[in-house]
Amino acid sequence: MNDVIRDFFKMESAGGILLVIAAAIAMTIANSPLGESYQAMLHTYVFGMSVSHWINDGLMAVFFLLIGLEVKRELLEGALKSKETAIFPAIAAVGGMLAPALIYVAFNAGDPEAISGWAIPAATDIAFALGIMALLGKRVPISLKVFLLALAIIDDLGVVVIIALFYTGDLSTMALLVGFAMTGVLFMLNAKEVTKLTPYMIVGAILWFAVLKSGVHATLAGVVIGFAIPLKGKKGEHSPLKHMEHALHPYVAFGILPLFAFANAGISLEGVSMSGLTSMLPLGIALGLLVGKPLGIFTFSWAAVKLGIAKLPQGVNFIHIFAVSVLCGIGFTMSIFISSLAFANVSPEFDTYARLGILMGSTTAAIIGYVLLHFSLPKKAVEEVASEKNA
């Protein structure tokens, strides 16, 4: 039994599977006699904040810390290091954020409260998308995985910018000043080539608290901390950034994200009507994810190649790009996160229907994306195809 559990957690798709299980459990509990207890638990106050608040502002800051680490590593030595390798996923990511937002706005332009959710379908759930792709194993070319990873990372970076610019509340000058001071200390530690992680974590904790009190969303502190962690250690030492990234990854993939899904996907269907489910808000989100994502990513990718701005990755064709662009319509955790910010100060009904739209669009995108990849990829593992050609 222990071997089965160990093998499961070694699977690339394990994180995505746990997300689905956590969301399904949350939906089941929320619509059972335990629904009131579930909501009461999430709204229980611990050390001055509700459990839900701790998950969304506290634990998700660790997730954004991991994003910061991944983005920095990719920029310095990975798929985003050179202009040639970064330009293609960067252009695709821009299209993948613009088109869904425009579709949502087209559906909700007449509603001044709903319009604030324009960024909800612009996000991609990197863990979920990579998990679906991992189900196809070695049939997926490495270059296609790198494209999806780079695209999703740039997408996440775009979401961070959107949160900072458009979903910030009333600002506290004093807290902001403390936050800027702690940011300066973090990068001073980096400049002084401090490679021990403890000082970064102490200063980072103060930064998180300052940002929490400033009116800017606290999760952004995680990204700043991630960018401050040094990639290279002192001579003969391991990389502090890679060490932290590898240490955090299992906790984020198998703990924080499933817990976030459990806390946020538990939508009570009581009072939900078919007319509400087919209203402009959920439809704008679902179609933004399901139609806008592939439309934007594929169109911008195709145009970039045809105009000579970028080249297709080796071993990848436009059918693969389209399949991946559909897969990027899985907004799930990131879209739910933005929804919680966008509709924090309006009727709870907005957030309920938004989350249902996210679940509809993300689930459909996951199924269609998987089917497209299944039929467009080689039937044999990439390594087997290569060895047969060389034989």
UniProtKB/Swiss-Prot annotation:
<dbReference type="GO" id="GO:0015385">
    <property type="term" value="F:sodium:proton antiporter activity"/>
</dbReference>
<feature type="transmembrane region" description="Helical">
    <location>
        <begin position="146"/>
        <end position="166"/>
    </location>
</feature>
<feature type="transmembrane region" description="Helical">
    <location>
        <begin position="87"/>
        <end position="107"/>
    </location>
</feature>
<dbReference type="GO" id="GO:0005886">
    <property type="term" value="C:plasma membrane"/>
</dbReference>
<feature type="transmembrane region" description="Helical">
    <location>
        <begin position="47"/>
        <end position="67"/>
    </location>
</feature>
<comment type="function">
    <text>Na(+)/H(+) antiporter that extrudes sodium in exchange for external protons.</text>
</comment>
<keyword id="KW-1133">Transmembrane helix</keyword>
<feature type="transmembrane region" description="Helical">
    <location>
        <begin position="171"/>
        <end position="191"/>
    </location>
</feature>
<keyword id="KW-0050">Antiport</keyword>
<protein>
    <recommendedName>
        <fullName>Na(+)/H(+) antiporter NhaA</fullName>
    </recommendedName>
</protein>
<keyword id="KW-0472">Membrane</keyword>
<feature type="transmembrane region" description="Helical">
    <location>
        <begin position="280"/>
        <end position="300"/>
    </location>
</feature>
<dbReference type="GO" id="GO:0006885">
    <property type="term" value="P:regulation of pH"/>
</dbReference>
<comment type="similarity">
    <text>Belongs to the NhaA Na(+)/H(+) (TC 2.A.33) antiporter family.</text>
</comment>
<feature type="transmembrane region" description="Helical">
    <location>
        <begin position="318"/>
        <end position="338"/>
    </location>
</feature>
<feature type="transmembrane region" description="Helical">
    <location>
        <begin position="14"/>
        <end position="34"/>
    </location>
</feature>
<keyword id="KW-0997">Cell inner membrane</keyword>
<keyword id="KW-0812">Transmembrane</keyword>
<keyword id="KW-0813">Transport</keyword>
<keyword id="KW-1003">Cell membrane</keyword>
<keyword id="KW-0915">Sodium</keyword>
<feature type="transmembrane region" description="Helical">
    <location>
        <begin position="252"/>
        <end position="272"/>
    </location>
</feature>
<dbReference type="Pfam" id="PF06965">
    <property type="entry name" value="Na_H_antiport_1"/>
</dbReference>
<dbReference type="InterPro" id="IPR023171">
    <property type="entry name" value="Na/H_antiporter_dom_sf"/>
</dbReference>
<feature type="transmembrane region" description="Helical">
    <location>
        <begin position="356"/>
        <end position="376"/>
    </location>
</feature>
<feature type="transmembrane region" description="Helical">
    <location>
        <begin position="117"/>
        <end position="137"/>
    </location>
</feature>
<feature type="transmembrane region" description="Helical">
    <location>
        <begin position="205"/>
        <end position="225"/>
    </location>
</feature>
<keyword id="KW-0739">Sodium transport</keyword>
<keyword id="KW-0406">Ion transport</keyword>
<dbReference type="InterPro" id="IPR004670">
    <property type="entry name" value="NhaA"/>
</dbReference>
